[in-house]
Amino acid sequence: GAWLVTPEYVKAVGKELLDNIQSVVASHPMKGQDALVKKFVQRTGEPFMTQDPLCTYSHVWLIKEAIEQAKSADPKAIREALAKLDISAGPATAAFYPPRVKFDERGRRVGAAPLIVQWQGGEPYTVVPAAVATRPIVWH
C-alpha cells in the first residue's frame, strides 16, 4: 500500500533495509511529471512526492472541471457534473493511470489500473507499468 512509500516510512525503517521493496499503489509520480515533482519538492521540502499530494493535485482540477461544467457552485450540480466527466488529458488526469477520468454508474473510475513502486537507493520509483515507469524494475 501507499504507506510503504512515504518519507516517514524511510525514516522509521532506514534506507538500507528498503532497497528493492515493492508496493502496489493507486498513484505515484510517473514518467513526464518531473516538473510537477520538482515544484512539489521545492515548495514542501519533502524528499519526494507521494500518492496523497499527487491525487489531491488532480482532485482539485477535477472539481474545477466539474464546477465549470455545472456552471454552478451547488454541491449536487457539481456531483452530477463530476459523474459525467470524461477527461483524457491535462492536470485533472495527472495522478491516474491510464490518464483518463470517467466514472461508471457505481462511481468507480473506468479502466483504473494500479502502479508498482520500488525502493531504489533510498527513494521510491514507479517501475510498472513500463510505459510510465520512472526507473526500470530491479530483480535480485
Please provide the spans of the model-predicted regions.
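Extracytosolic ligand-binding ectodomains
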Residues: G1-H140
